[in-house]
């Protein structure tokens, strides 16, 4: 008796055997009845060259997708996060995300535009100037984005000295006598940089009323001029106008919700008011928002000091002293002068 696996059975009624050669012994379990030899022949049938080429092309596409998809997904995520952060005025986050996106697509004009806006609103003017130079002569299809970048470029001019101001600084070796400075300001009433520079000198000399007057004039020309808003917050604190000081900090935060220095400025106002617990909370918040700003670190040093946490205060001072940044050293020196009593920060 033959093996039943190779017999034509009632599973294929009316079948005369192998559909290819007619042999009675077929392999069951397949739609087409074939004997073992014919089925093996079909299995070993040569694949046409065209099909091989097509299959190879599909394989290459799949391999490319496997490598490029994670990169493209990452790029898309950075752009999406950066765009969302920009709409929420979280410009530190926006600058971080668009920087990562730009590293993948350095020639993408829209990414560079978003990066420029974030840098400007973070007052990272060195980064902004580099990006702005790249954008000169470029075409931007997004009209709304173009308008924002164009406005930022126009405003950037007020953050650097004009040629006439540079010449005056050269003549007096960066130590312009008061009468000469006043004459220059009268002749250049719209030179925001010069007026702010003079206001800074007045602040350092404790000439608060004329400083206040000049800063208000600056803000009439540009209500969002960051340095003037920041100095106004400090000025009003020194004048004991604490609500007004907070108002200027809020103006900064309305422009950039991640302006950590505005939060730190509020913390210093609370220290002036001897609201030390609230001051510490604000100082910690400023560090959480922007841990790289030395002003925020110096503020936290002061907050630790007035809250009696000398261990954390001294540890942070030591950490800051390892930093070679001149601005960091200047801010920390001020904080240590307050701690030692060399500078009087508030009444005892």
Provide a role label for each language-model segment.
Residues 68-104, 159-187, 191-204:
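Alpha-helical segment of the N-proximal tetratricopeptide repeat
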Residues 34-37, 298-299, 303-348:
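Terminal, low-structured helical/coil segments at or just beyond the last alpha-helical repeat
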């Amino acid at each position: 008796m033959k093996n039943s696996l190779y017999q034509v059975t009632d599973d294929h009624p009316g079948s005369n055997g192998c559909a290819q050669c007619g042999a009675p012994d077929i392999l069951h379990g397949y739609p087409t009845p074939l004997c073992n030899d014919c089925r093996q022949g079909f299995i070993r049938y040569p694949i046409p060259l065209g099909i091989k080429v097509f299959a190879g092309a599909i394989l290459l596409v799949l391999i490319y997708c496997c490598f490029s998809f994670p990169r493209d997904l990452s790029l898309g995520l950075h752009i999406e996060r950066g765009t969302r952060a920009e709409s929420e005025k979280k410009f530190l986050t926006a600058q971080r995300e668009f920087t990562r996106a730009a590293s993948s697509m350095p020639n993408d004009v829209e990414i560079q535009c978003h990066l420029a806006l974030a840098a400007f609103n973070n007052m990272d003017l060195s980064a902004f100037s580099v990006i702005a130079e790249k954008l000169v002569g470029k075409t931007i299809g997004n009209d709304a984005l173009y308008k924002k970048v164009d406005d930022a470029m126009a405003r950037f001019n007020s953050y650097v000295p004009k040629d006439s101001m540079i010449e005056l600084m050269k003549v007096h070796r960066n130590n312009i006598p008061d009468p000469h400075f006043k004459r220059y300001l009268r002749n250049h009433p719209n030179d925001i940089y010069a007026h702010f520079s003079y206001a800074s000198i007045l602040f350092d000399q404790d000439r608060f009323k004329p400083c206040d007057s000049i800063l208000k004039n600056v803000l009439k020309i540009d209500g969002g001029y960051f340095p003037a808003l920041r100095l106004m917050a400090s000025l009003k604190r020194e004048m004991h106008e604490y609500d007004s000081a907070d108002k200027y900090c809020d103006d900064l935060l309305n422009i950039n919700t991640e302006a950590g220095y505005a939060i730190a400025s509020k913390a210093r106002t609370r220290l002036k008011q001897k609201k030390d617990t609230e001051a510490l909370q604000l100082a910690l918040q400023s560090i959480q928002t922007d841990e790289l700003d030395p002003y925020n670190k110096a503020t936290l040093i002061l907050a630790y000091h007035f809250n009696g946490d000398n261990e954390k205060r001294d540890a942070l001072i030591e950490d800051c002293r390892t930093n070679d940044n001149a601005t960091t050293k200047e801010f920390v020196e001020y904080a240590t002068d307050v701690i030692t009593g060399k500078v009087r920060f508030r009444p005892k």
